[in-house]
From Swiss-Prot:
ADP binds at A153, V154, S155, R156, A157, G158, K159, T160. Belongs to the pyruvate, phosphate/water dikinase regulatory protein family. PSRP subfamily. One of its GO terms (molecular function) is phosphotransferase activity, phosphate group as acceptor. PANTHER family: PYRUVATE, PHOSPHATE DIKINASE REGULATORY PROTEIN 1, CHLOROPLASTIC (PTHR31756:SF3). This is Putative phosphoenolpyruvate synthase regulatory protein. Coiled coil: none annotated. HAMAP family: PSRP (MF_01062). Keywords: Kinase, Nucleotide-binding, Serine/threonine-protein kinase, Transferase. Bifunctional serine/threonine kinase and phosphorylase involved in the regulation of the phosphoenolpyruvate synthase (PEPS) by catalyzing its phosphorylation/dephosphorylation. It catalyses: [pyruvate, water dikinase] + ADP = [pyruvate, water dikinase]-phosphate + AMP + H(+); [pyruvate, water dikinase]-phosphate + phosphate + H(+) = [pyruvate, water dikinase] + diphosphate.
Amino acid sequence: MSTIRPVFYVSDGTGITAETIGHSLLTQFSGFTFVAERMVFIDDAEKARDASQRILAASERYRVRPIVVNSCVNPYLSVILAESGALMLDVFAPFIGLLEHELNTSRHSCVGRAHGMVDFETYHRRINAMNFALAHDDGVAASYDEAEVILVAVSRAGKTPTCIYLALHYGIRAANYPLIDEDLNSDQLPLRLRPYRKKLFGLTINPERLQQIRQERRPNSRYAALDTCKREVAAAEQMFSAERITTLSTTHTSIEEISSKVLVTLGLQREMF
């Protein structure tokens, strides 16, 4: 059996749902090279037939059955896609019937409900959270009064991407504070952070991994030196321990996992967008 498998994320909308679920499924299988292609806004029969032909062509090119992760709402489009002979993984089909029976009503076949701008209030909360994260990146803002979360770590430990993820996916007002040499000379929290102790969450990282990341940013600099990374990480961890700040290593942890841990630890109940 070939270890190369073509994968198609097909959607009548943005494809975010299909790609997210498909990626989560495929990461469970090692030893394969998945060649992925996104087919989005497949919202009529003509587009579905064209997509089906492209999928069929891939099966002939790779001499193996393609995998299709399909989130098209219209069942008729799914039938056309299935004519390609691919393995069809329908995101909605296994659950729609069960929900219709339980709720005693039929679904509304409306494209884009999962990631469309359906609720304007929610959308604006999300945008405002994103603006907040950018305005409070790397300790730029003077006040953290409105922050729901403040991530604390040395430079390049994963603070900014986690804040952006929390803002985009949960509408969380997330700020971050970079620990600098002056901060790391003490086991105590920096003065700016002390009033916000209940909002703090510490991130740490393996020094060797940190050195690799910093080397890409500033090659052969003192900033990227391994001994610098070791010293900063050790000092930050000592501070977190002394101040009893919950800490998580980002070395082998995804942004999704970090974000979930932050929400649970700080008791923030927020529905994912």
